[in-house]
Amino acid sequence: MESSLDRLNFDEFVAKLLIHESKKKNKSFVDHGYIEKEKTKLRPNKVFLNNMVRNVQSHNRGINNRRRDQKRKQLISIKQDNDLNVSSERLSRRIDVPRPTSKKKRLYKETPDLDEPGSREKRVSQKGQLKIEKV
């Protein structure tokens, strides 16, 4: 993971390149007979500056993309670790999510218990609903 120190070093490197480029340009102007006063007003080449800005931006985007990818991979590995049951090495159901109950079990639990022993019951199904009637 890139630290802020690495970024400072890269920015310092860019600044040194800019200074070097401006010195080169200033030297060429002095060689061609420009006076010292005009030399101080000179700036580095705009194309060079734009290229350097683009390089810095792409470098920073690369750092951010790598950080995002690392975080995503870390979250995926944590999630996989949580989903794996160590004893069976198979995917296990999460503890906080209850198992789905089937309709039959749910309907059976909702039916009233018949207190009388040996009583008969008649099950009638109407449109998917189960009703129990005493006979």
From Swiss-Prot:
Query: Compositionally biased, Polar residues: which spans?
Result: 77-89
The protein here is known as: Uncharacterized protein C13G7.09c
Identify the GO cellular component terms for this protein. Answer: nucleolus; nucleus
Region (Disordered) residue spans: 56-135
**What is the scientific name of the source organism?**
Schizosaccharomyces pombe (strain 972 / ATCC 24843)
Q: Where is the composition biased (Basic and acidic residues)?
A: 108-135
**Residue ranges with Basic residues bias:** 64-74
